[in-house]
Amino acid sequence: MDNAPALAAAADSSDPRTGLRAVAALRRLLEQLEALQVDNAREHGWSWQEIAELLGVSRQAVHKKYARRASAR
């Protein structure tokens, strides 16, 4: 996560190869952060609906994406 500022800067590169690589890396980082915070919210007793509202998605979408992960813990 320490490299997020460098990745954001690289995403603004005029070199498409550099920019696209940075965008892909930022996407992976974002997925990791989202999963971490969904786990955190569930551990704090949040409902799927509460999480979904803050992520701007449906309850079904967030449940489908993370329910298996949550039950594995």
Please annotate each region the language model reported.
Residues 1-24:
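N-terminal acidic leader/helix
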Residues 28-45:
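Short, amphipathic alpha-helical "recognition" segments used to contact nucleic acids or chromatin
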Residues 49, 60:
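Key DNA-contact positions within bacterial/archaeal DNA-binding proteins
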Residues 53:
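Alpha-helical residues within the helix-turn-helix
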Residues 70-71:
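C-terminal flanking helix
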